[in-house]
Amino acid sequence: MKPPFEQALGIIRQLKRHGYEAYFVGGAVRDLLIGRAIGDVDIATSALPEEVMRLFPKTIDVGSKHGTVVVVHEGTAYEVTTFRTDGDYEDHRRPESVTFVRSLEEDLKRRDFTMNAIAMDERGTIIDPFGGQEAIERRLICTVGAADERFREDALRMMRAVRFVSQLGFALSEDTKSAIVQNAPLMAHISVERMTMEMEKLLAGPFVAEALPLLADTGLFAYLPGLAAKVQLLRSAAAFRWPWLTKREERWALLCRALDVKDIRPFLRAWKLPNKVIDEAGAILAALDDVPRPEEWTNEQLFSAGLERALSVEAVRAALCGAPSEPHHEELRRRFAALPIKTKGELAVNGKDVIRWAGKPAGPWVKETLDAIWRAVVSSEVENEKERIYAWLMERNRTHEKNC
């Protein structure tokens, strides 16, 4: 048994010692069978939440009314969820109620896709009542039961299906794809925040080229923020090298450029992204326009952007052009390391020095003067020493006075 499961065996065994059933379930079991890196290990049990909390000394009630308790075991947190069935779904988003049951199969039956409805016992025996292993072998995403019913229960499952295409490289089964086309309008019931979470995972997957056209083909695009008029560009966006990007800001910047978004901020705000992400994606695209070619970075532009943003700019450019960015990254690192200063805080002078030298009250001119100083320093026009900067500034002022 793989280490992530071995580390959680103590929870399974404790539950079984007290007469309860307990199994590993969900994405960890799926990823084990696929051969992917295993993430969080989840456990399903016949024990009720209050029974779970009695059996373990350190638990966190994160949703006991829905059956979930976090058990902290040997320093690691595990979600332990009681077998349950879901009641009728409210607004195609969430069940109005849940009913705790004692049957593993009933619990697995409520899950979205067959590959996620597989369990494993403490000996490593696989329990697969809905054909999840066959779907994995055929590299297909199939729903548990009728696809139409699953998507009417929770419309976000349609977006999850396409996201799994991006993450796993699997295809949608014919029934799954057909049901998404039929039920795509139900996405109108889903919050933007939930859509954004799935979209970010989709854009980060290694098989984005297969997933993006599916958003267009299934009609999901029409219910995603800002995409209703972008169907052809969405298909074309599959041609870019998305897997070369490592940061969410880079992916959103590439999406904006791929979709020819003119006004970036409203588009990204519609996805309810954090301001920090919006600002950075916008700054990446602005720098991409200001520096037309990788070899055309000036010292001033490199300093203003900072190394991390400059590297992101070249990563996005590489993804757009299909040319590897590593050689340009190495050159940017070398050039940035050679800059006399890396931040404005490293300047040998500050605003107080400038005010004292000028002998006049503070005002907007102070920032303008400091900006002129750092530009002169990074372009090697003057050394970053207080005396030399003072002399340079006095000469600059004399020249300015003569010209006036």
Swiss-Prot record:
Superkingdom of this protein's organism: Bacteria
Pfam family, one: tRNA_NucTran2_2
Biological-process GO terms, alphabetical: RNA repair; tRNA 3'-terminal CCA addition
Record has Cytoplasm as a keyword: no
EC number(s) stated in the UniProt entry for this protein: 2.7.7.72
Keywords of the record: ATP-binding, Magnesium, Metal-binding, Nucleotide-binding, Nucleotidyltransferase, RNA repair, RNA-binding, Transferase, tRNA processing
InterPro entries to which the protein is assigned, alphabetical: Bact_CCA-adding_enz_type3_sf, CCA-adding_enz_C, CCA-adding_enz_firmicutes, NT_sf, PolA_pol_head_dom, PolyA_RNA-bd
Broad class of enzyme this protein falls into: transferase
Positions annotated to bind CTP: G27, R30, R111, D154, R157, R160, R163
Catalytic activity: a tRNA precursor + 2 CTP + ATP = a tRNA with a 3' CCA end + 3 diphosphate; a tRNA with a 3' CCA end + 2 CTP + ATP = a tRNA with a 3' CCACCA end + 3 diphosphate
List of residues binding ATP: G27, R30, R111, D154, R157, R160, R163
Gene3D superfamilies: 1.10.110.30, 1.10.246.80, 1.20.58.560, Beta Polymerase, domain 2 (3.30.460.10)
GO molecular function: ATP binding; CCA tRNA nucleotidyltransferase activity; magnesium ion binding; tRNA binding
Cofactor: Mg(2+)
UniProt: Mg(2+) binding residues: D40, D42
Subunit details: Homodimer.
Function (record text): Catalyzes the addition and repair of the essential 3'-terminal CCA sequence in tRNAs without using a nucleic acid template. Adds these three nucleotides in the order of C, C, and A to the tRNA nucleotide-73, using CTP and ATP as substrates and producing inorganic pyrophosphate. tRNA 3'-terminal CCA addition is required both for tRNA processing and repair. Also involved in tRNA surveillance by mediating tandem CCA addition to generate a CCACCA at the 3' terminus of unstable tRNAs. While stable tRNAs receive only 3'-terminal CCA, unstable tRNAs are marked with CCACCA and rapidly degraded.
Family statement drawn from the similarity comment of this UniProt entry: Belongs to the tRNA nucleotidyltransferase/poly(A) polymerase family. Bacterial CCA-adding enzyme type 3 subfamily.
Record's miscellaneous remark: A single active site specifically recognizes both ATP and CTP and is responsible for their addition.
Protein name, entry field: CCA-adding enzyme
Gene symbol of the encoding locus: cca
